[in-house]
UniProtKB/Swiss-Prot annotation:
In the C-terminal section; belongs to the protein kinase superfamily. Ser/Thr protein kinase family. In the N-terminal section; belongs to the leguminous lectin family. Its main location: membrane. The chain crosses the membrane at residues 267-287. GO terms for molecular function: ATP binding; carbohydrate binding; protein serine kinase activity; protein serine/threonine kinase activity. It is an enzyme of class 2 (transferase). The gene is LECRKS5. Residues 288-652 are cytoplasmic. The keyword Lipid metabolism does not apply. SMART domains: S_TKc. This is Probable L-type lectin-domain containing receptor kinase S.5. InterPro entries: ConA-like_dom_sf, Kinase-like_dom_sf, L-type_Lectin-RKs, Lectin_legB_Mn/Ca_BS, Legume_lectin_dom, Prot_kinase_dom, Protein_kinase_ATP_BS, Ser/Thr_kinase_AS. It comes from Arabidopsis thaliana (Mouse-ear cress). Residues 21-266 are extracellular. Residues 24-257 are annotated as: Legume-lectin like.
């Protein structure tokens, strides 16, 4: 960094109008696990079974009971709601699941904004963990909530099945029953809720599916100035309660996005900032000299440091000596496996097990693969994605640190020579497939920028201690933007042979459809226990026909598709259920990319929301260019500069 940059920054500060700064507070929990406890403030609430139990379940409550409990779970970082001249806006969407344990159940759950981290004493029962008999109707309570009430506890309640807006009070400002909408809050079914505040009006939407934003799902909209009831800074989260009437109050997923007000500008701020900028400029200059001297010694790479410092995803930076100590200096006894990009070692850091990937010096694009992993998954949080904990670059060593997966990669369980040793039951395999579909659907549709994995295969699927699947190895992954342009040609083909869609060899393009194809091959692998290059007939056939896909289509044509079942399952499976999964896998492997289902459709089939797509008994011929889809679609693609080479077909 040069002095001129500091002077330019100083000039901008002096000439710009000093205004209130606004930042975006944004987080997304597609599901919950124990590691998320560090991101929440919990008061008598727990993370169990992939959800926040806002009031304890049977095993978690004081004295082993769920009666007469109040609980609270808040996001750890406070949200600045307003300042002298500005009011924040926010949107939040969450999936709740409330199931009664008595008949009727009680009492309810609420989304809240409050400065208080804990529920008031004696706030169980009708008080929903928000207020108690003493603080009810008291402006010092400082709480605004959207309640999902499951019991008519007082005369003002419409019924025991309504949504309401409450301000410092258990008696509602506005309430609407859901009974006329065919929705029962404590049915034990997932409900999706969306709360929107535009600075003037608060609107609430509720639906039994994910299409909550449709206007018909609007429950109520109410004009309210939140700054009149709440302090400048609040927490957002959930509160719930039970009485002698009990229920389980679960939050299964939660996302929040809002404009966070940082405060009002003034001249004091200006005069404090000017000398700081000057000092920072000098420090940056000296720092640049230091980094350059270290770079010459081969210890760091300023280009990599700068690129990672500027990206939104910025996981922890480790020291090389820390990782050497954690892995026993990368000792052979700690080696977990080896893949196309390098070796993986088990380590111990701050009392927890970690996995450290040491990117191979022979990987000619090691820097690109290294940066790709950090920039794509560094800030993703999904229960079916391997969590990236941090990175290190020192002395020409590229190192990535992940959460440790005790059961290793999926391929070592699928491709056992002695099938009788397999411990992957049909239920376990189904859960693996469903978990991976959730991960891929999240990458394609749930992120701010769509992410293509481009290397989906069994060796890139990791298993935790309960055999839950997590997709990993994002060395080839890329973030892409929507574009009205057609696909760009690429210089090289990316992926692993056997998992690559046929059109890839002709156009060299990576798309969501090529990801779906690879996922289809993986589905067939998981069910059959066969590798993608499995050959049934040992004659001279071409690569297109010599594959697990062709073998499955032959079985389907002969009416014996369930014969593909891995002998390791010992015929302990539902044939119709397996047939449905195999047909879905074949649909994903359709030669025409425009005929493959989206991951959203795949997930709906796996969760029983819809039937598998129609699959022809004869495998369609591969024709290029493919027949266009029957609808207009927005194109997602990668440019040539974003392509890497093929990866080796080996496990970690």
């Amino acid at each position: 960094m040069r002095f001129s940059l500091a002077w330019k920054l100083l000039f901008l500060i002096l000439t710009c109008k000093i205004e209130t700064q606004v930042k975006c507070l944004k987080f997304d929990f597609p599901g919950f696990n124990v590691s998320n406890e560090l991101e929440l403030i919990r008061d008598n609430s727990y993370i169990v079974f992939g959800a926040i139990q806002v009031t304890p379940d049977v095993t978690g409550g004081p004295g082993g009971t769920i009666a007469n409990q109040a609980g609270r779970a808040l996001y750890k970082k406070p949200f600045r709601l307003w300042s002298k001249h500005k009011s924040a806006t926010f949107n939040t969407t969450f999936v709740i699941n409330i199931s009664n344990k008595t008949d009727p159940g009680g009492e309810g759950l609420a989304f809240v904004l409050t400065p208080e981290e804990t529920a008031p004493q004696n706030s169980s029962g009708m008080w929903l963990g928000m207020v108690n008999e003493r603080t009810n109707r008291n402006n010092e309570s400082r709480i605004v909530s959207v309640e999902f009430d499951t019991r008519k506890s007082h005369s003002d309640d419409l019924d025991g099945n309504h949504v309401a807006l409450n301000v410092n009070n258990i008696n509602s400002v506005v309430q609407e029953s859901l009974s006329g909408r065919g929705i029962k809050i404590d049915s034990g079914l997932d409900l999706t809720a969306h709360v929107r505040y535009d600075g003037k009006n608060l609107s609430v939407y509720v639906s039994r599916n994910l299409d909550v934003f449709e206007q018909r799902n609007l429950v109520f909209s109410r004009a309210i100035d939140l700054s009149a009831y709440l302090p400048e800074t609040v927490y957002v989260g959930f509160t719930a309660s039970t009485s002698n009437f009990t229920e389980l109050n679960c939050v299964r997923s939660w996302s929040f996005e809002g404009l966070k007000i940082d405060g009002d500008g003034n001249m004091l701020w200006l005069w404090i900032t000017i000398p700081i900028v000057f000092i920072v400029g000098i420090g940056a200059f000296l720092g640049a000299l230091y980094l350059r001297s270290r770079s010459k010694a081969g210890e760091t790479n300023p280009d990599i440091e700068a690129e990672l410092d500027n990206c939104a995803a910025n996981p922890q930076k480790f020291k090389l000596r820390e990782l050497k100590r954690a892995t026993g200096n990368f000792g052979a006894e700690n080696k977990l496996g080896q893949g196309g990009f390098g070796m993986v070692f088990k380590g111990k850091w701050q009392g927890r097990d970690i996995a450290v990937k040491r990117v191979s010096e022979k990987s000619h694009q090691g820097k690109q693969e290294f940066i790709a992993e950090i920039t794509t998954i560094g800030n993703l949080n999904h229960r079916n994605l391997v969590k990236l904990l941090g990175w290190c670059y020192e002395r020409k060593e590229y190192l990535l640190v992940y959460e440790y997966m005790p059961n290793g990669s999926l391929d070592k369980y699928l491709f056992l020579e002695d099938k009788s040793r397999s411990n992957l039951t049909w239920e376990t395999r189904k859960n693996i497939i469903t978990g991976l579909s959730q991960a891929l659907e999240y990458l394609h549709n749930g992120c701010e920028k769509r992410i293509l994995h481009r290397d989906i295969k069994a060796s890139n699927v990791m298993l935790d201690s309960d055999f839950n699947a997590k997709l990993g190895d994002f060395g080839l992954a890329r973030m892409i933007q929507q574009s009205e342009m057609t696909h760009h040609s690429t210089k090289e083909i990316a992926g692993t042979p056997g998992y690559m869609a046929p059109e890839t060899f002709l156009n060299g393009r990576a798309t969501v459809e090529t990801d779906v194809y690879a996922f289809g091959v993986l589905m067939l692998e998981v069910v059959s226990g066969k590798k993608p290059s499995y050959v049934l007939v040992k004659d001279n056939q071409n690569n297109y026909n010599n594959s697990i896909v062709n073998w499955l289509w032959e079985l389907y044509r002969n009416g014996t598709i369930t014969d593909a079942a891995d002998p390791g399952m010992g015929n302990l499976f539902d044939k119709e259920e397996m047939k449905s999964v195999l047909l879905l896998g074949l649909a994903c492997c359709h030669p025409n990319p425009n005929q493959r289902p989206s991951m959203k459709t795949v997930l709906k089939v796996l969760t029983g929301e819809t039937s598998p797509p129609d699959v022809p008994t004869e495998r369609p011929a591969f024709v290029w260019p493919a027949m266009p889809p029957s609808f207009s679609d927005i194109d997602y693609s990668l440019t040539g500069s974003q392509i890497n080479s093929l990866t080796e077909l080996t496990g970690r």
